[in-house]
Design a protein with these regions (language model features):
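N-terminal presequence-like segments and the immediate start of the first folded domain
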Residues: 1-72, 78-132
């Protein structure tokens, strides 16, 4: 996998513009993961919900024999721009703890709500594991 970063472009913070995947391997597509825990309970804090969603993503990737380094795309659905911005430090810490220094192409969308009204974030993932 090769990250696309034209030399004349400024490097984005927290994501990459794109990746190229070349060769055989395994694609993994995860349904959107929200910030609800295994019991379906939600914390009210945006950073805590993002942390839970990211942990769920890492767990599912592990089930597929993959890790954060295999993520090639994230799509975030957020219910509040102000809460997201206020939770920046906590979200950054959660990212570092779960995804490390992996910054795949990402899209963030602000929406009016999610199916479960308690959810503040939902994250979809596409990953690719090269053949060995």
């Amino acid at each position: 996998m090769h990250v696309l970063q034209p030399a004349e472009w400024s490097k984005p913070r927290g994501f990459s513009h794109g990746v190229v995947v070349d060769g055989p391997g395994k694609w993994i597509v995860l349904a959107g993961q929200t910030g609800g825990n295994e019991a379906g309970e939600y914390q009210t804090d945006m950073a805590a919900q993002v942390a839970t969603a990211l942990k769920r993503i890492v767990k599912l990737l592990g089930e597929a024999g993959a890790g954060p380094e295999h993520i090639v795309r994230l799509t975030w659905y957020l219910t509040s721009k102000s809460e997201y911005e206020a939770a920046g430090a906590g979200i950054g810490a959660a990212w570092k703890e779960t995804l490390g220094r992996n910054f795949p192409p990402s899209t963030l969308l602000y929406i009016s709500g999610l199916v479960d009204a308690r959810a503040k974030v939902e994250i979809e993932v596409t990953a690719f594991v090269p053949a060995k």
